[in-house]
Amino acid sequence: MGAVKRSHHQVDVDTEGKDSHRFREAGANPVALTGGGLFFFTEKTEVVYNPALIARWFAGKADIVIMEGFKSESVPRLQFADLAHMAEKDDNYVVGFITAETAGFPREFGGKPVFNRDDAEGIGEWLVGSFIPSLGKGI
């Protein structure tokens, strides 16, 4: 599984005072940092990366990519919502709901599954079974 977090704020995974930060501050673009079994790649860009383009970077490295922060994109998504607001949060791209409710909530809303936010195992099994059927066998 891969993961992407989209932010509407300036982000920086580099540390001031480190060589890679100094390279970038001096105008190097892009800058990569590797070591200890990790690889980071940063690039200043005006490009707005959409989920399909980002997912290509994960090809061959992850069976599924979880992306947070792309709610205006036309991609399948699990929608966080309390019970009172599920109907207004539902649209053609919502494939299921996640709620903070801990007991007595419906397991389905509008034909879509509803999960408690702490049910990582249930959410994971549903994702695999729904989006990676070949891996879902035997779960």
Enumerate the language-model features and the residues they cover:
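Phosphate/Mg2+-binding loops and adjacent switch elements
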Residues: 64-137
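Short, hinge-like loop/turn segments at secondary-structure boundaries
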Residues: 18-22, 49-50, 84-85
